[in-house]
Amino acid sequence: LKEVVPNSIPAHLIEFNLGSSWIAPELYEEYVKDKTDVDVKFTAAGGTWFMKEPHWTDNEKNRSFGVHSDLLGKHIMGHELIEAAIQNKTITVSTTRKHYDGTSETITDKEATQACSSRIDEIRQEFKDWARNKMQSNPEMSDKIEQVYNDLFNNYVPIDIPSEYIPEHFGGATHNITLRPHQAKAVVRGTMQPLMLAHEVGTGKTFTLISTAMEMRRLGTARKPMIVVQNATVGQFVASAKELYPNAKILTLEDSDRNAEGRKNFYAKIRYNDWDMIVVPQSTFEFIPDSEERQMTFIQDKIEEKLTVLAKMKDADKSGRNLITRQAEKEVEQLKEELAELTTTLSEKRTAKDEKKRAVTKQNTEVKAREMLERRTDETENFDDMVIDALLIDEAHEYKHLGFATAMQRGVKGVDPSYSKKSQGVFLKTQAVLQKSHGRNVIFATGTPISNTAAEIWTFMRYLMPSETMKEYGIYYFDDFVRNFGNIQQMLEFTTSGKFKENNRFAGYIDLPELVRIWSSVSDTVRTKDAGGVSDKIPEMEGGKAQDLYLPQTTALRGIMKYVKAELEAYDKMSGKEKKENSHIPLTMYSIAKAAAVDARLVDETAEDDPNSKTNEAVRQTLRSLKETAS
């Protein structure tokens, strides 16, 4: 064992954020004291840090570390900015004024709000320098951080299966086809644990999935493996399965049977017959209902998750002092909001209000959770009753919108907590299989596991990694994952309306080697260039990377962008209520601008066919390439 234990990562190579869950709260408390001269206490619970502050926080040092709003005559104290930074929140400087006629108006100081955003970003960077200096001057603290980090994140060695344990041909497979080494190794891994086959296009995921299902069946770890594939590739996939395993008993759904009656007969065949492999189109798979018991468990988990996020929210009086004492739970899922009653009448009123808010939230969350599960399904046996004990899903990126609760506000770009109902259904089915198979027999496959948002890698870990393991790593909640491995920065970005705007964005990762190590515990990553001869068939990209071409803005595009800009400026001037009623405007304008940038005719069919459009430039470049490479 000593030979394979990873080398300890020295403290000077370890990065951590303001808010990393594995850091002792005393370090954050010392930082607040040093910068603001305010004594606070931090408590970690349910994926965030709660700050308990003293009654009196108004001192010169705290004020100078904060931000002042001349427009509203308000001051955001330094410790409040640090709290926002540690919770990855933004601060909006505003006030609500009531008029004599009973109406009210919310006034926002945009300059002070932007100043708070910039200051919070500065605090995140300043903390890293401050902590680094502390570690240099305090060797004992440095050693402790090094030990905690290595014990927590540097404790896994990626599996390496020796070639002598990999058969040339798996039992029952034709000897006319030999899997590549990376395929055979992935099959062996897939029979041992839940796994993401993060194999690039062209590396042979189809044969890997087929072989894994058949090996599960041969070894007796699964009696009824199901493979989910895209509708258009069902026939091709089944043909590949018969080619690799000529004697396999395979059930699939023909195109002519993809109707309600055909699906009903198909489900009966699944339940009452013995199959080596069941190949299901995605659309049919999504029609299979889940058991009521599993749905109820899902709903209860969602309620608990939502209440956990509610428990994170700061409840402050007019002076900005916290009135609620929060307690961390022993297990994150069992977090219960403990609202301590304070001795004053005001606190009693607030406590009653909070309990009412909690009850309403619980009710709303249950309704929301039920909506997440409400999708069109067939009236047939549920997935549990079909006795499927192995589930292999091709093109798994179709199910990456699992959704999650977060205390981060919408001010952080690159974070998408939205969900899709089909993803919820897949999650329930994977949980059913994991339960039946004692924590294995779930295989995902995709060439693009991470394509758009920071949440995707975390989402796939939720599918495949035991919740207890995620808790041990301190990444069970998305907010903890971001604080431990994310890098949030303020960046100047080009907006849909053609202006530059500073946004807080999930800009990348820190401690990437350790994150990759955790990810590799549930994934098998293969790039085309590493796939043994596959890359030889793919022509090299000109210049080694995509080329940027700059074109002048067309007259039609200029007119469309002027319209988009005017609409968005009008939207920015709306009140909060009006923005809520017209929430479709930003997305609509973004879609229009994106389409017009390709070709104005996608927005206005009467627009001219401009020779300077991206469409025409793409045609010219394609013709040039064809002529240059013509033999």
Language model region names:
Residues L1-F153, P246, I270-I278, R294-T344, ...:
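Charged, low-complexity intrinsically disordered regions
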Residues E200-V201, Q230, T448:
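P-loop (Walker A) phosphate-binding loop of NTP-binding proteins
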Residues V188-Q193, T203-T221, K429-L434, L464:
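Walker A/P-loop NTP-binding motif
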Residues V157-A198:
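Conserved pre-motif I regulatory segment
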Residues T208-A239, A248, K436-R440:
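Conserved SF1/SF2 helicase motif Ia
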Residues L195-E200, M226, I443-F444:
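Short hydrophobic/aromatic beta-strand immediately N-terminal to the Walker A/P-loop
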Residues A232-R258, K269, L464-E468:
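Conserved helix-turn-beta segment of the N-terminal RecA-like "Helicase ATP-binding" lobe
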Residues R263-K353, V360, N364-V367, E371-A390, ...:
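Inter-lobe coupling linker of SF2 helicases/translocases
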